[in-house]
Curated annotation (Swiss-Prot):
Native source species: Cyanidium caldarium
Family of the protein in this entry: Belongs to the PsaJ family.
Protein's name in the database: Photosystem I reaction center subunit IX
GO biological process, one term: photosynthesis
Function, in words: May help in the organization of the PsaE and PsaF subunits.
C-alpha cells in the first residue's frame, strides 16, 4: 500500500470525528442561547 494512502485512511476518521463534534457543539450552544431559532423560517 502507498504510504500516503495509509496516512489518509488513518487521519480521515479522526478529522471527521472532530469536525462532527465541533458542529454539534456549535449547534448545541446556539440552541441553548436561542432555543426557538430552529423553528423560525429565516
Amino acid at each position: 500500500m502507498d504510504k500516503n494512502l495509509l496516512k489518509y485512511i488513518y487521519t480521515v476518521p479522526v478529522i471527521s470525528t472532530l469536525w462532527l463534534l465541533l458542529t454539534a457543539g456549535i449547534l448545541i450552544e446556539i440552541n441553548r442561547f436561542y432555543p426557538d431559532a430552529l423553528f423560525y423560517a429565516f
